[in-house]
């Protein structure tokens, strides 16, 4: 996420002063965060809260905009009108605002399916046009794949196949004819290409800015992917370190943010990026000990409301000895602890608006009286947004 923020900061002074070259001053005293960083951090804050509902995201986004009403470059006119109104309905935007705020989602989940699902949710609150949704999903997917060791070729092929973007161009081909374009369709592919053409983190940022146009958003999207792929410090050329007299671009990025934004970014890295889960995917032989034998179990009347369902999917909690968490794959929610799978559940949304458990399986290690409740109570929540929506029968906790 810091890569996205730094890209925004670097591109901030070139948005209305396009330079069409990679040879420029990376940072100076005028370089600052814009609406791209504010909204990126707002989404990260929402993820930290754990209650992954659209209503909570709308509340969080509007709170951030009202606290930072006049960033460099301003907000988009339709978005600003929405943010300062009592109206919460989306306005069918296809703009790149959905993609420039989604970086944190690429770091927060354990499967590509989860990542794309939540990216869609973050877009839909404002950018519910198919192109707006696609731009957010493609950006988050690229970040997820980059941080989970996919190659550039694998990322390119997946994004082209799934989202239909043409990524076979080069920055040198794009640069001479590229102009300001605020659409996802005219920003996200170019930002991904800047990453694909790069050799290290800094080069990726420079390539994105050199294209011209909406430089802060281009570099924000590129920077989010490049950080996940390269890291921000280890790939820096020596000239950057000596010229700017700092070793870590992470530190320089953080130092250009207000204290309360610094706090959210730091908490996001400590809680989500650096949580060091012991378990990543059910087919990962490096983390699963032994073959799992699934035993179908008897169902009881268990259901979750929309907010609790999404929060269950996100749950992750450190325990005194090990850790447990939830991930989604093949239509099931898998609950694990340490290196062992415990249970898996299949939910279905029914006519009453709740998600009901329609299938349930356990392993020999999954002997918990009520694992769904256990996960939600001890899971991934930040006060004062503690879990409160679990429903058993007609009783709500």
Tell what function each PLM region has:
Residues 1-275:
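Structured, active/binding-site neighborhoods that engage oxygen-rich ligands
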Residues 98, 134, 186, 321, ...:
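Short, well-structured alpha-helical interface segments that form or flank functional binding sites
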Residues 119-123, 308, 373:
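Charged, low-complexity, helix-prone segments enriched in Lys/Glu/Asp/Gln
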Residues 273-290, 365-373, 394-397:
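Charged/polar interaction segments and conserved charged motifs
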Residues 274-330:
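Negatively charged, low-complexity tracts enriched in Asp/Glu with abundant Ser/Thr
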Residues 332-366:
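Amphipathic protein-protein interaction modules
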Residues 353-397:
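Polybasic, proline/glycine-rich intrinsically disordered low-complexity segments
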């Amino acid at each position: 996420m810091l890569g996205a923020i730094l890209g925004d900061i670097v591109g901030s002074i070139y948005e209305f002063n396009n330079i069409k070259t990679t040879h420029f001053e990376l940072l100076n005293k005028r370089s600052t965060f814009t609406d791209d960083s504010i909204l990126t951090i707002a989404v990260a804050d929402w993820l930290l809260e754990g209650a992954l509902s659209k209503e909570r995201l709308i509340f969080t986004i509007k709170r951030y905009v009202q606290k930072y009403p006049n960033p460099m470059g301003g907000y988009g006119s339709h978005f600003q009108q929405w943010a300062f109104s009592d109206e919460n309905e989306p306005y069918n935007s296809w703009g790149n605002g959905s993609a420039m705020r989604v970086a944190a989602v690429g770091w927060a989940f354990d499967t590509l399916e989860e990542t794309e699902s939540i990216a869609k949710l973050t877009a839909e609150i404002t950018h519910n046009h198919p192109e707006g949704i696609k731009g957010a999903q493609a950006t988050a997917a690229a970040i997820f794949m980059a941080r989970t060791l996919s190659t550039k070729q694998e990322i390119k092929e997946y994004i082209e196949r799934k989202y239909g973007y043409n990524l076979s161009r080069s920055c040198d081909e794009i640069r001479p004819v590229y102009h300001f374009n605020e659409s996802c369709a005219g920003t996200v592919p170019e930002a991904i290409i800047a990453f694909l053409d790069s050799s290290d983190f800094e080069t990726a940022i420079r390539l994105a800015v050199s294209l011209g146009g909406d430089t802060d958003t281009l570099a924000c999207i590129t920077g989010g992917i490049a950080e996940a792929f390269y890291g921000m410090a280890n790939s820096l050329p020596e000239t950057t370190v000596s010229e700017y007299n700092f070793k870590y671009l992470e530190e320089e990025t953080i130092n250009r943010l207000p204290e309360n934004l610094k706090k959210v970014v730091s908490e996001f890295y400590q809680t989500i990026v650096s949580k060091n889960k012991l378990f990543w995917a059910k087919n990962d032989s490096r983390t699963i000990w032994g073959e799992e034998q699934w035993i179908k179990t008897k169902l009881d009347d268990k259901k979750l409301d929309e907010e609790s369902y999404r929060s269950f999917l996100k749950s992750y909690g450190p325990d005194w000895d090990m850790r447990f968490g939830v991930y989604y794959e093949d239509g099931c929610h898998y609950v694990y602890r340490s290196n062992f799978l415990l249970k898996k559940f299949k939910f279905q949304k029914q006519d009453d608006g709740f998600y009901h458990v329609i299938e349930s399986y356990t392993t020999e290690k999954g002997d918990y009286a009520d694992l769904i409740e256990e996960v939600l109570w001890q899971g991934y929540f930040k006060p004062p947004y503690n879990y409160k929506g679990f429903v058993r029968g007609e009783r709500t906790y």
